[in-house]
């Protein structure tokens, strides 16, 4: 998942609005939907594409073009029935990834059974953090060092094999700093920039979280 994917956020309460705003602020294409016109009005200034619709209705899902969306985030934890219906309709529409906010572990089991690809607890993962994770997913491991800086593991690409870090100029091209190399269970913090990279190893890098998009 990345900035090149299309997103829909269904439910514009505080959590859903935070997810949508963070995605929009980072250049992602986002469709935001809520059944309450007041919530839509409150979000329209920061989220350009906002629609008022009942996403538990099949016709609304079709009209909104949800079948063309890559990732749907359903943010209606207080309404289990609506969340279940929304998950079902989104999966029936062919959405590859459906993420849904839930209120407790029982709801988590139910939502997983009806097809949710990922179920999140808002008290454990903020809306802003979810958006950042969506934008930077695809890495083997990601650790937020601060609000702006993250450390991630990235697989050595096929086109990098046999080349050195000097030749690749990763810092210049992608604004990342290679701090270690993982080879299986072994991690070496002594990074030789003149050593040719091997297939199957991972680079551990530190960079501005948003600039990590360049590596995707």
Language-model segments: residues:
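Cytosolic regulatory regions of ion transport systems
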Residues: 1-216
């Amino acid at each position: 998942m990345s900035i090149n994917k299309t997103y829909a956020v269904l439910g514009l309460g505080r959590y859903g609005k935070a997810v949508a705003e963070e995605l929009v602020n980072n250049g992602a294409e986002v469709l935001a939907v809520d059944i309450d016109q007041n919530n839509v009005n409150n979000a329209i200034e920061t989220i350009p594409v906002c629609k008022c619709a009942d996403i538990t209705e099949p016709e609304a899902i079709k009209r909104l073009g949800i079948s063309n969306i890559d990732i749907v985030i359903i943010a209606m934890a207080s309404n289990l029935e609506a969340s279940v219906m929304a998950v079902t309709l989104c999966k029936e529409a062919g959405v590859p990834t459906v993420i849904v906010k839930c209120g407790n572990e029982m709801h988590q089991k139910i939502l997983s059974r009806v097809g949710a690809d990922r179920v999140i607890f808002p008290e454990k993962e903020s809306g802003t953090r979810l958006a950042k994770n969506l934008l930077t997913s695809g890495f083997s491991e990601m650790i937020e060092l601060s609000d702006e800086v993250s450390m991630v593991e990235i697989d050595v690409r096929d086109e990098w094999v046999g080349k050195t870090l000097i030749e690749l100029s990763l810092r210049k091209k992608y604004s990342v700093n290679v701090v270690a190399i993982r080879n299986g269970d072994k991690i070496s913090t002594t990074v030789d920039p003149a050593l040719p990279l091997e297939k199957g190893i991972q680079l551990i890098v530190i960079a501005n979280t948003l600039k990590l998009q360049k590596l995707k």
